[in-house]
Amino acid sequence: MRALEANGRAMLLGLQNVQGYNPTHIARYDEYMSALNGGYEQNYHFIDVFKDGLDSPLLDLLNVRYIIVPAQPSQEDTEGTQQFKQFESTHPTVYEDGQTRVLENRAALPRAWIVHSAQRVGSEKEALDLLSTSQVDPKQTALLEEEPSEELSQSDDASTDEAEVTEYEANQVQVKTSAEAPGLLVLSEVYYPSWKAYVDGRPAPVYVADGLLRSVAIPAGEHVVELRYESWTLRMGIAISVVACVALIALTISAGVRHWRKGVGGKKHTTTSTSP
């Protein structure tokens, strides 16, 4: 579950948030959020959801279940206030105090789900156009930018499919799946080439689904899917940092030993003399 909050306090409260500050946006996420907001380009270091994006189907794909807003909307923006009131009519208030209100987005998709149909698209933009206009139901069909090497099969009863996130860390996600037929596990997580997938310990391709998300083909039955962030540049950076730290420690110790020896040697050669 993620939240969409009205200020930058999500990290302090332990909330996952689709907005934020980052000087190095992932291009796909930037394009996705721009499409979500009706074409408004993102600030070069901020990612924001504007009022036009609150009703976008693309927001549901990001697992945004709760929207945190000020208790009283701005009185200066008459059009925005009216638009927000319409939004409130379909998003019930689940918490309210004098300063904050929490609205529930019941259309939000889960963190992980299974589909048994895939449609090939030529680009991220094509996928976002289809999803933004509700021409494709992402709960049923994944939009992929390449043909999956695995065969998908329609399930007689997809309602029995289950995808349970059993482990979630910054660099690793584990999902237990159960499906009546082969399908695609879709995760509401941003795709990046350094993410690697393993199905029951065996390597599996990671596909870009719906212009942004990660997806992995799964066989029928019960399986464990692991996604790990395995970046060779990250490993190289860590290795260089470790070597540099060891070298710095060694140089510091060496300099200290030389200084100590020099001090001891100087004392041994020091003599005193007295006048007759």
Whereabouts are the PLM-identified features?
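Extracytoplasmic
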Residues: 1-158, 180, 202
